[in-house]
UniProtKB/Swiss-Prot annotation:
This is Chalcone synthase H1. GO terms for biological process: flavonoid biosynthetic process; polyketide biosynthetic process; response to UV-A; secondary metabolic process. GO terms for cellular component: cytoplasm. Involved in the biosynthesis of prenylated phenolics natural products which contribute to the bitter taste of beer and display broad biological activities. Chalcone synthase that can use 4-coumaroyl-CoA to produce 4,2',4',6'-tetrahydroxychalcone (also termed naringenin-chalcone or chalcone) which can, under specific conditions, spontaneously isomerize into naringenin. Also able to produce phlorisovalerophenone (PIVP) from 3-methylbutanoyl-CoA (isovaleryl-CoA).
Amino acid sequence: MVTVEEVRKAQRAEGPATILAIGTATPANCILQSEYPDYYFRITNSEHKTELKEKFKRMCGKSMIRKRYMHLTEEILKENPNLCAYEAPSLDARQDMVVVEVPKLGKEAATKAIKEWGQPKSEITHVVFCTTSGVDMPGADYQLTKLLGLRPSVKRLMMYQQGCFAGGTVLRVAKDLAENNKGARVLVVCSEITAVTFRGPNDTHLDSLVAQALFGDGSAALIIGADPIPEIEKPIFELVSAAQTILPDSDGAIDGHLREVGLTFHLLKDVPGLISKNIEKSLVEAFKPLGISDWNSLFWITHPGGPAILDQVESKLGLKPEKLRATRHVLGEYGNMSSACVLFILDEMRRKCAEDGVKTTGEGLEWGVLFGFGPGLTVETVVLHSVGI
């Protein structure tokens, strides 16, 4: 007769959870940030709000975003005028859209990740799906399983309404799944579509206008597993540790509420200041066990939020400008894609490292950090270990 401890030992993987493949996808519709204010005020029938339009132009100009991708085309918005009003009942139309499009965009990214991984999809044991765009039962995890033709016995976890920190959350959850289930291969998908948050401008709610200037659509997928099969699976990054915390004195700093008018978004406090003031504590807790205290010795992947957050974090920690290159690049090319952002940045970093011929996937460095920030204010901190290229 075996003991419970013997069973547990046999169930556990030996090595750390490892990212084995990354895939990304966006809708085809690309919008240039320089042209967006004119388009946005025209499509929402708000061109008479000239002062507000000038304010929005300044927001877009300071955003450091060059372009974004959006499922919502001009044709779709003309067919759904309530989406263009500031607070018209429109939840049904938004839901009808996203419950179909979120899994579809997730499938695109997942298909790319599975192709890079190179193993049969029947080897996928777990699915972790994350979106802040809409809610449904059965969820986007179920729809993705059907779209990809995964085994009906695949173990699914659906994460709705987490917000911008959740790119870190999915890594933390996948790490625990991979390390506690020997042979597990976890498909992680973050898929976000702004159809739930798009609305016309309003003079008294500038935080809603900030969201219109920053958010874009995108989906990213990873394959995560421990103990990669030599010569068959190719490690990209190892997940060494993961933590989550709520920042002090940050209640109500970022709020999102699902209402008849869609998902409303509120920024109520100095979010960049709160994050930059508290970030070092998370770094110290994560890296003290490794004996690391030089933040410039790490490679950096951080949820971009907006340029003010990046500027204040960079200043507070004394980071060299090149530390946030990959993060700023993704913000510029895609905008803020909520939970998917940090996974896009992982992909950008490993791609650029291979292109430049540096010795590791982490810009030639061994250790790195991934940060997710979002409602709460909640911070996810993931310690990464690069692999040789």
